[in-house]
C-alpha cells in the first residue's frame, strides 16, 4: 500500500481462486429405522463449489470466482446474471 489511504487497485491480489473438492466420503452407519425415515423425510440440500466466470459490465474483462451453494441457489444466480445483475471488476470500480 502506498500513501495513507488504501486504494482498491492496490488491494487486488494477483492470485486466482481455485476450486477445491469439499465433498466428504464418509457414510452414515448404524441408523435405526426411525432415523432412516426421518432422514428420508427431510429434504437434503447438498452444497457444492461452483466456478463462475462473467464479463465485467464496463470493460468486458472476465471476472472469475467460486461460490459454495445448493443447486437451486446456483440456478438463481445464473438467472440473475443472465437478466438484471451485472458485476464490475476492481479496475473499473475506481
From Swiss-Prot:
<dbReference type="GO" id="GO:0052170">
    <property type="term" value="P:symbiont-mediated suppression of host innate immune response"/>
</dbReference>
<keyword id="KW-0805">Transcription regulation</keyword>
<dbReference type="GO" id="GO:0003677">
    <property type="term" value="F:DNA binding"/>
</dbReference>
<keyword id="KW-1035">Host cytoplasm</keyword>
<dbReference type="GO" id="GO:0030430">
    <property type="term" value="C:host cell cytoplasm"/>
</dbReference>
<dbReference type="GO" id="GO:0003700">
    <property type="term" value="F:DNA-binding transcription factor activity"/>
</dbReference>
<feature type="region of interest" description="E7 terminal domain">
    <location>
        <begin position="1"/>
        <end position="42"/>
    </location>
</feature>
<dbReference type="GO" id="GO:0039645">
    <property type="term" value="P:symbiont-mediated perturbation of host cell cycle G1/S transition checkpoint"/>
</dbReference>
<keyword id="KW-1048">Host nucleus</keyword>
<protein>
    <recommendedName>
        <fullName>Protein E7</fullName>
    </recommendedName>
</protein>
<keyword id="KW-0922">Interferon antiviral system evasion</keyword>
<keyword id="KW-0945">Host-virus interaction</keyword>
<keyword id="KW-1121">Modulation of host cell cycle by virus</keyword>
<dbReference type="Pfam" id="PF00527">
    <property type="entry name" value="E7"/>
</dbReference>
<keyword id="KW-0899">Viral immunoevasion</keyword>
<dbReference type="GO" id="GO:0019904">
    <property type="term" value="F:protein domain specific binding"/>
</dbReference>
<feature type="zinc finger region">
    <location>
        <begin position="56"/>
        <end position="92"/>
    </location>
</feature>
<dbReference type="GO" id="GO:0006351">
    <property type="term" value="P:DNA-templated transcription"/>
</dbReference>
<comment type="subunit">
    <text>Homodimer. Homooligomer. Interacts with host RB1; this interaction induces dissociation of RB1-E2F1 complex thereby disrupting RB1 activity. Interacts with host EP300; this interaction represses EP300 transcriptional activity. Interacts with protein E2; this interaction inhibits E7 oncogenic activity. Interacts with host TMEM173/STING; this interaction impairs the ability of TMEM173/STING to sense cytosolic DNA and promote the production of type I interferon (IFN-alpha and IFN-beta).</text>
</comment>
<comment type="similarity">
    <text>Belongs to the papillomaviridae E7 protein family.</text>
</comment>
<dbReference type="GO" id="GO:0008270">
    <property type="term" value="F:zinc ion binding"/>
</dbReference>
<keyword id="KW-0010">Activator</keyword>
<keyword id="KW-0553">Oncogene</keyword>
<dbReference type="GO" id="GO:0039502">
    <property type="term" value="P:symbiont-mediated suppression of host type I interferon-mediated signaling pathway"/>
</dbReference>
<keyword id="KW-0863">Zinc-finger</keyword>
<keyword id="KW-0238">DNA-binding</keyword>
<keyword id="KW-0804">Transcription</keyword>
<comment type="function">
    <text>Plays a role in viral genome replication by driving entry of quiescent cells into the cell cycle. Stimulation of progression from G1 to S phase allows the virus to efficiently use the cellular DNA replicating machinery to achieve viral genome replication. E7 protein has both transforming and trans-activating activities. Induces the disassembly of the E2F1 transcription factor from RB1, with subsequent transcriptional activation of E2F1-regulated S-phase genes. Interferes with host histone deacetylation mediated by HDAC1 and HDAC2, leading to transcription activation.</text>
</comment>
<feature type="short sequence motif" description="Nuclear export signal">
    <location>
        <begin position="74"/>
        <end position="82"/>
    </location>
</feature>
<feature type="short sequence motif" description="LXCXE motif; interaction with host RB1 and TMEM173/STING">
    <location>
        <begin position="22"/>
        <end position="26"/>
    </location>
</feature>
<keyword id="KW-1090">Inhibition of host innate immune response by virus</keyword>
<keyword id="KW-0862">Zinc</keyword>
<keyword id="KW-1114">Inhibition of host interferon signaling pathway by virus</keyword>
<keyword id="KW-0244">Early protein</keyword>
<dbReference type="InterPro" id="IPR000148">
    <property type="entry name" value="Papilloma_E7"/>
</dbReference>
<keyword id="KW-0479">Metal-binding</keyword>
<dbReference type="GO" id="GO:0042025">
    <property type="term" value="C:host cell nucleus"/>
</dbReference>
<keyword id="KW-1078">G1/S host cell cycle checkpoint dysregulation by virus</keyword>
Amino acid at each position: 500500500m502506498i500513501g495513507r489511504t488504501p486504494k482498491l487497485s492496490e488491494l487486488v491480489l494477483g492470485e486466482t481462486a481455485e476450486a477445491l473438492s469439499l465433498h466428504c466420503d464418509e457414510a452414515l452407519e448404524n441408523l435405526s429405522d426411525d432415523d432412516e425415515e426421518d432422514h428420508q423425510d427431510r429434504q437434503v440440500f447438498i452444497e457444492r463449489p461452483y466456478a463462475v466466470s462473467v464479463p465485467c459490465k464496463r470493460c468486458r474483462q472476465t471476472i472469475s470466482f467460486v461460490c459454495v451453494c445448493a443447486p437451486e441457489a446456483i440456478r438463481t444466480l445464473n438467472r440473475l446474471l443472465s437478466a438484471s445483475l451485472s458485476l464490475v471488476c476492481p479496475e473499473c470500480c475506481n
